[in-house]
Amino acid sequence: MIQAEEAIRAARGLIGTSYETLDCINLIKKVIRTCVGGDKRYTTAGTNALWDSDSKRGKYRDLTWKQAGISGAKAGMLAFMGVGTGDVSHTGLVTERGTVIHSSKSRGGVVETELTAKAGWNGLGVHRMIEVAENAGAVPTGTAYIVCAQTGLRMRKRPDVRGEYMQMLSD
C-alpha cells in the first residue's frame, strides 16, 4: 500500500511533464508503479473504466469506494471529472492542500490546481493501492501543562491544580 504523502510527493515530482508524455490516467499509473508499496506491473484501462472499476463486473476493480461530489476530499483520494454523464473523462490525485495534481491537455502537462466543482471536479474515489490520509494536515494545537509528581508526569489542559488529567505517565 502506498502512503498518501509518498503518492503526492511522486506526483509533484512530475509537475511540468508534458501531456504528450503523460496523460491523466498514465500519471496515476506512474505514481502507483514507482512509489514504495506500489506495483511495478500495475495497469488499468482508461479513466471511465477506472471510475467503473468498483463493480463486480469491472475488469480491474481498482476503486474500493467512490462518490459523486467532492465534499470530504482527503489527501490520497482520486478526483474525477464527468461523473454522472456516462463519460468520466479526467482524473487526478487529491493533495493535503485541497488541490489536485493532474495532467491537463489544455494546460499542456502535469499541473496542481484547485479542487473545486467550478473547475469541473465532481467525483472522488479511493484507489486500492493508495492509502488515504485520514488526518491529512492535522496538527495538534493548544497548550498542555505538565505536572511533575512523585508518581510520574501528569498532563492537564489548564494550569490550575484541580481538574481531570489528559494523560498520566508513571515513572
Task: Outline where the language-model segments fall.
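Active-site nucleophile-His-acid catalytic modules used for acyl/amide transfer and hydrolysis
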Residues: 4-22, 39-40
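SH3-family beta-barrel domains
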Residues: 133-157, 168-170
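Active-site nucleophilic cysteine motif
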Residues: 19-36
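Solvent-exposed, acidic/flexible segments
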Residues: 1-4, 20-25, 85, 168
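Solvent-exposed, polar/charged alpha-helical surfaces in well-ordered, non-transmembrane soluble domains
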Residues: 5, 9, 13, 26-30, ...
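Residue-level recognition of short, solvent-exposed, well-ordered loop/turn junctions
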Residues: 71-74, 164-170
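...with weaker cross-activation on analogous glycine-rich loops/strands in unrelated enzymes
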Residues: 2-5, 38-124, 131
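Short, solvent-exposed loop/turn positions at domain surfaces
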Residues: 66-67, 160-166
